[in-house]
């Protein structure tokens, strides 16, 4: 932090320093690095230049209404800007064990070197637990860690706080499978831009899930039926498989490769990522609709409401619950469902 003038040091948000991962000058407008710089400069002024500032990778977090968004290191956009080859993984986990109440969605994206697995960056979005996951990833990046080190992190585990396989461990396993070639992946952008004459989109979710939304033109063969219906799939096309978040897609990929299919990829992050990324941005105005049946204020009638708690259920659990409810209710009745 000593400048070209021997008695002048530079600290704070306005100074440039080499990024630890790229070596290129950059600015980091965060209070934590600025305070550390102040301590380092004070020590160096008193004791001589004994401590070198290693730089900051830009770990940040923000509260967006009831959600938390956090980031550390280099995101895909910045890696493209610097021309650094990278791979990425997207995983959807839960803030803690799904069987324990109030488990909430947590999405993690990693960027890493496609050969060595060196971690470049991480992004996390969720309602609970995003902060501690991004802190763990940031620590590993600062230490030059890899995606394989994510698997080795020893975290405090009990069902209210995490899962036996923590979300960052899951992200590490998925990234490792991508690097090793055990799971070739396609991104949502590749799916959206694919040549439909040479590709087949295979949805291995249940029929009920498919009916709630699917990638246009995809063929629905549920995972449980796949082995018996492999003959329906073309071997002269590239097959992009997807499920809700990626796990069933991975299992389907293994089934197909075991039967000799070679041009098969799994959608990274599943349909949840694709649907979110391609959804149109809408400005909606809240309205109140009445039809004379469901409005107790106007009719004075008490409407029968079926309440469903689907919290903690893994896909396709919530979809199956609501399907059963729809089949059982009568005309004018209402469903209230809570799911994570």
Model regions and ranges:
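Short, glycine/acidic-enriched loop or turn micro-motifs at the edges of active sites
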Residues: 16, 206, 225, 312
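Mid-to-C-terminal Rossmann-like scaffold of FAD/NAD(P)H-dependent oxidoreductases
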Residues: 14-128, 159-163, 167-193, 199
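Short, surface-exposed connector motifs at secondary-structure boundaries
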Residues: 118, 234-238, 328-335
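Domain-level signature for proteins that mediate thiol-based redox and metal-cofactor handling
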Residues: 295-340
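A structural signal for the hydrophobic beta-strands that form the central parallel beta-sheet
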Residues: 10-11
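Rhodanese-like catalytic fold shared by cysteine-dependent sulfurtransferases
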Residues: 148-159, 163-189, 193-200, 207-240, ...
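A short, polar/charged loop-to-alpha-helix boundary motif
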Residues: 128-147
């Amino acid at each position: 932090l000593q400048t070209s003038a021997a008695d002048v040091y530079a600290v704070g948000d306005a100074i440039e320093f080499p990024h630890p991962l790229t070596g290129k000058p950059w600015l980091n407008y965060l209070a934590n690095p600025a305070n550390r710089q102040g301590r380092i400069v004070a020590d160096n002024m008193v004791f001589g230049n004994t401590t070198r500032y290693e730089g900051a990778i830009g770990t940040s977090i923000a509260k967006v209404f009831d959600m938390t968004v956090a980031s550390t290191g280099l995101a895909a956009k910045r890696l493209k800007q610097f021309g650094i080859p990278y791979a990425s993984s997207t995983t959807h986990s839960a803030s803690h064990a799904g069987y324990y109440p109030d488990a909430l969605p947590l999405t993690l994206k990693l960027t890493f070197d496609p050969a060595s697995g060196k971690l470049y960056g991480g992004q996390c979005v969720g309602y609970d637990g995003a902060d501690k996951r991004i802190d763990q990833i940031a620590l590993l990046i600062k230490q030059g860690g890899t995606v394989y080190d994510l698997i080795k992190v020893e975290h405090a585990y009990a069902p209210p706080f995490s899962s036996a396989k923590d979300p960052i461990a899951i992200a590490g396993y998925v990234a490792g499978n991508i690097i090793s070639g055990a799971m070739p992946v396609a991104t949502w952008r590749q799916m959206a831009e694919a040549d439909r004459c040479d590709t087949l989109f295979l949805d291995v979710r249940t029929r009920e899930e498919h009916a709630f939304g699917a990638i246009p033109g995809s063929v629905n063969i549920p995972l449980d039926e796949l082995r018996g219906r492999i003959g329906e799939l073309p071997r002269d096309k590239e097959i992009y498989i997807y499920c809700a978040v990626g796990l069933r897609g991975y299992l389907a990929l293994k089934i197909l490769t075991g039967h000799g299919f070679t041009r098969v990829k799994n959608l990274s992050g599943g349909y949840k990522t694709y649907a979110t990324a391609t959804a149109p941005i809408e400005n909606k105005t809240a309205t109140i609709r009445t039809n004379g049946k469901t409005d107790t204020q106007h009719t004075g009638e008490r409407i029968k409401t079926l309440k469903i708690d689907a919290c903690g259920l893994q896909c396709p659990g919530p979809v199956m619950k609501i399907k059963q409810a729809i089949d059982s209710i009568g005309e004018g009745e209402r469903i209230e469902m809570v799911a994570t």
